[in-house]
Amino acid sequence: VAHWLRDRGFDAYAVTGGVHALLGAPIPEAPPGEGGPRDWKAGAAALRHRRFQIYFGGVLLSLAGSWVEAGAFGYVVLLLGGSAAMLGIIGFLNTIPNLLFALPAGVLADHFDRRKILLLFQGGNMGVAIALAVLWATGGLTVFLMGLLAFIGGSLGALSFPAFQSMLAGTVPPKDLESAVALNSLALQVARFVGPAIAGVLLASVGPTWVFGVNAVSFLGVLGALVLLPSSRAKIASVSVGVRGAMADGIRYVFGQRSLASLMVLMVFAGMFATPPVAFMVPGLVRFQLHEGPETLGILISLIGLGSVLGSVALLVLARRPNKGEPGLVCYLLCAAAIAIIGLSTSVPLSFALALIGGFTGVVFIGLSTVVVQAASSEEMRSRAMAIWAAALVGVLPIGALITAALTAWLGAGGAVAVDGAITLLGGLGVLLWRPEVRWLGCAALPEACVAATDPASFAYLEEEVEAARAA
């Protein structure tokens, strides 16, 4: 009954209303604005705002170009004579900046004009793409230069991320923030799904120079959008405490909120143990666990991408729910279970189904977590909060990749993926037991009955609710 009420908008009254309904008493009505249907039109509400339209168009074009390049990058490394191990090293160089620079980037975005920061760093990324195109066309590109440019590009991306996320929040009023985040996620997943396919066509028809050139041109979209958008700066007078002090303030701010602290622990488990199997181990699973070839690999990767796109569409509705904790936690646990089972699976149809489920649930969890952090953070702390979120999810990926590599050497590809999924699942269950209030992430205020349910010493409150309902 509580779930039935919650699904119809009575989130803040699910427990109390459930008790009343069970005993036949009148059900308390939710105040205006706390309930009601969440339809698809409301999920796209952010598109009504001109600033978001400009931001969304520029980012979508840039993301498409970035994923076209990402789809071809590893192939170009192999064309230059690089090994499979070198692919891993270059992947490490591209992702380690998220751990090194996330927090300083958050401080930067909280204290300076975010628009100017993004113009500088995105212009730098455009320069990296131009350098790749020119070097390949002139025959000067080497594996060493690919690694160097991968590190530079990863660093510029890590320094841009908090400013991008904070600018996103400034393009819409607070009531449409969930819609903006969901649409931003949809743009990312569509670009991720389509980009590598475009890269394959370009590589086969015109070669790597055009792949890198397309990415360079795509940055004109985001740079043009940034020129049209107004300045975006948090209301902070100066960096009076210094960079280290500002970083420490951000950490205290995030981990001083129990719900955000719990969410960050979940993000670490997701980044360290759930992401490496998807990012690095799919070819190994197909070759050594399923004993299949490139056709199966292509279908499996496509199903992960399709699940991600469908998850982003579902996020348009789910992100507008007052309670984002329950659907987010369910998706986290389902994604972890899918990873664990696919590591043990020898059935191609089962693996296809699990890939679709994993792509869907993973994107929903990450999208809802983004909404929660954005909405729960004050304007002057938002960039640092998102930087910590990025460090927790993406910054730990290189460490997770090393752990997964060690597990693979010991247990094989399937065993490593199964263990990664099991650790992710146990981590989520542990957080749920440690911080039960993680189930109500995103609620403006927990209903008293929910608060009581999180504290074993307060179950007397629920007994009083039952007695009051029975008397009524």
Features from the language model and the residues they span:
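Rhodanese-like catalytic fold shared by cysteine-dependent sulfurtransferases
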Residues: 1-36
